[in-house]
């Protein structure tokens, strides 16, 4: 697939051995492709893990910590959400004042700073339409960058992460639900006010 070829080209400098090998990729995913529920995150996380595993064959001293950090770093290049898909159960991606070890390069596991109630959460996804979404993630991100309200959105998101740190520690479900619902509605509001505008729900 074209997206995979572009991804492999981007990461050549981190895996020089790719240039000298033919890579055959066989994958299967229970999520519908490009429907807006992060199928690319799981696929890029899996592919990145395989590549670092391949690298580890020539470096038997590679630590588990380094393995997962590099896999997360590489996965992020293919899909931002993929950086959070390699360990956990609760991972933050992106630098935030709330978490000292957080950064923009790879996901940071915050499970040990999180109340047990959140570790019992599961997703249930009802697929109504398995078709592909009309606006790709990359197109959506581009529209967000040009949105006149994006700067306010970023500031609110930063504040929400700070608030969520205490909420995740305490297990305060009411405030957790309030923030997550507000986040979802705000994202959809930005979509409606982008140019061109679109509806994802």
Where are these regions (language model features)?
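ATP-binding N-lobe of GHMP and related small-molecule kinases
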Residues: 1-35, 49-65, 112
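Catalytic-loop motifs flanking and including active-site residues across diverse enzymes
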Residues: 3, 39, 43-47, 156, ...
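Domain-wide signal for the mature, well-folded portions of proteins, strongly enriched
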Residues: 16, 46, 56, 64-75, ...
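Residues in well-ordered beta-strands of folded domains
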Residues: 26-28, 94, 127
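Long, hydrophobic, well-ordered secondary-structure blocks that form the structural core
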Residues: 33-85, 92
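Short acidic, glycine/serine/threonine-rich loops at helix termini
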Residues: 36-39, 87-88, 96-97, 136-140
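Alpha/beta catalytic cores of group-transfer enzymes, especially the acyltransferase/condensing modules
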Residues: 66-118, 190, 198
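C-terminal nucleotide
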Residues: 112-201
């Amino acid at each position: 697939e074209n997206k995979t070829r572009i991804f492999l080209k981007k990461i050549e400098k981190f895996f020089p051995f790719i240039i000298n090998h033919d890579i055959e990729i066989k994958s299967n995913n229970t999520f519908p492709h490009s429907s807006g529920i992060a199928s690319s995150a799981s696929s890029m996380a899996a592919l990145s893990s395989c590549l670092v595993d391949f690298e580890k064959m020539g470096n038997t001293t590679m630590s588990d910590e380094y393995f997962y950090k590099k896999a997360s770093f590489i996965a992020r290049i293919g899909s931002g959400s993929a950086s959070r898909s390699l360990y956990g159960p609760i991972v933050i991606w992106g630098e935030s004042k709330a978490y000292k070890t957080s950064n923009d390069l790879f996901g940071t596991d915050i499970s040990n700073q999180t109340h047990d109630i959140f570790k019992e959460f599961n997703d249930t996804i009802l697929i109504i339409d398995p078709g592909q979404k009309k606006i790709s993630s990359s197109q959506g991100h581009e529209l967000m960058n040009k949105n006149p309200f994006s700067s306010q959105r970023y500031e609110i998101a930063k504040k929400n992460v700070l608030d969520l740190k205490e909420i995740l520690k305490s297990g305060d479900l009411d405030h957790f639900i309030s923030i997550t619902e507000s986040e979802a509605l705000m994202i959809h509001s930005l979509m409606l006010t982008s140019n061109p505008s679109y509806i994802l729900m």
